[in-house]
Amino acid sequence: MPVSEFLIHPEYEILLILYRDIFVDEALLKNRFSREFQEAAAAIRLDEMDIKKIGLKEGGNARISGSSKAIVARVIKDQKPHQGYAFMPLSPWSNSLMHFNGENFAAMRVAKVKISHTTLPVTGLQELL
């Protein structure tokens, strides 16, 4: 484990919104354990201002903590500005960050999460199962 992982990276609260993605769905249908599926599904889209504020790099990794679990996902810079909001495709990675209260499935699509810089590798699908 690199020394940088022992340093405290500040966490920022952000609103995470889940969406369906045709490329993730296609990769899932081909092989849910493939590298193609992991690269498409374990990614978080942030705008340029949030990437700079949090200290992330496009293509780098971010640690995202939900109410019950934390994952590591790859950072993608979105073309449109949407400061304070992040987007992830529906997948085992994004679903692990959501909290279901048993009443409203729509509430599972939006959650406040904490995000910070990390040098750890992207969370593997086997770790989520």
Language-model-derived ranges and their functions:
Residues M1-L129:
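Long, contiguous, secondary-structure-rich segments that constitute the structural scaffold
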